[in-house]
């Protein structure tokens, strides 16, 4: 009996070490980051991982082997689903959103992106359940003059709020968040 308990304990320890070791290993390729703002009465915090371009085609047609093909849901970062925490009384793209924490997904397109807030949090980024969507909004993109190697989220002030900028390669999606 003691031998069985010892074997089970060893297997549990090895399994946990493997799990946490793999987690740390994968996160070394896409470091975690936090972007937050309290400007213009808008309180937003985004927790995400920053994948790198690494010479890949990021946004484009599926047949061209784009990492995030046009028209397909993307986790908007790497590893776990990106989390966005919103303060009271905010609208995204003109649509009101309750205060709380959501998963942030996007659907890249050639001239616009769809931004999705999903009520399911804590999952791996590829485990998207569209039945839990609480917001879908189209936003414009702009072209950067230089390449952004690591996916980066930052904020720019606009009248009455901020634009949350999703920036990678030469593409930036502008997500208006207003009070």
Model-derived segments and their meaning:
Residues 39-66:
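Short extracytoplasmic
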Residues 1-4:
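Positively charged n-region of N-terminal signal peptides that target proteins for export
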